[in-house]
């Protein structure tokens, strides 16, 4: 009888850890496409946008990220490799920047490419309410979104999803 109870508990624990990623219209998100010039993040399936969100970029938005501290958002192909909750930015999903070519370029130039590029929500304090951030580029190179949009993307995108960031 104890082994049956243990089996039931183990089954419950396994199922509770299963992915809870949602789908849009019966289609999973295959890729995140960021269009920097349009300030858009699109969730893509079969090459077509399923949903589009407005985003904010680094304070120096033109051009690809070159060195640590340049406040630019990178351009290229990356992956969502981990995620976390944050007191400062609510939900955050890490982008695998720098990729191999970013690292090689930085090594050739003798500089640090930077790191910790995230897709994240916005701070929401009395001093700086969330709507203050939505219309300007305010990050240090990350991709900022309204918290309600970030919660939705968090639930729709699984770790390992490709991220393409275009100029």
Positions of predicted regions on the chain:
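N-terminal signal peptide c-region/cleavage motif recognized by signal peptidases
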Residues: 13-16
């Amino acid at each position: 009888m104890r082994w049956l109870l243990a089996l039931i508990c183990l089954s419950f624990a396994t199922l509770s850890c299963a992915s809870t990623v949602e789908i849009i219209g019966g289609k999973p998100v295959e890729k995140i496409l960021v269009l920097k010039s349009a300030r858009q993040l699109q969730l893509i399936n079969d090459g077509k946008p399923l949903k589009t969100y407005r985003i904010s970029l680094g304070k120096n938005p033109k051009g690809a990220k070159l060195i640590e501290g340049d406040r630019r958002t990178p351009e290229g192909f990356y992956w969502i490799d981990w995620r976390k909750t944050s007191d400062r930015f609510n939900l955050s999903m890490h982008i695998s920047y720098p990729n191999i070519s970013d690292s090689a370029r930085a090594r050739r130039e003798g500089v640090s490419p930077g790191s910790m590029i995230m897709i994240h929500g916005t701070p929401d304090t009395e001093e700086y309410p969330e709507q203050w951030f939505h219309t300007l580029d305010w990050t240090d190179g990350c991709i900022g979104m309204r918290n309600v949009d970030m919660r939705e993307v968090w639930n729709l995108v699984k770790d390992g999803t490709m991220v393409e960031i275009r100029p």
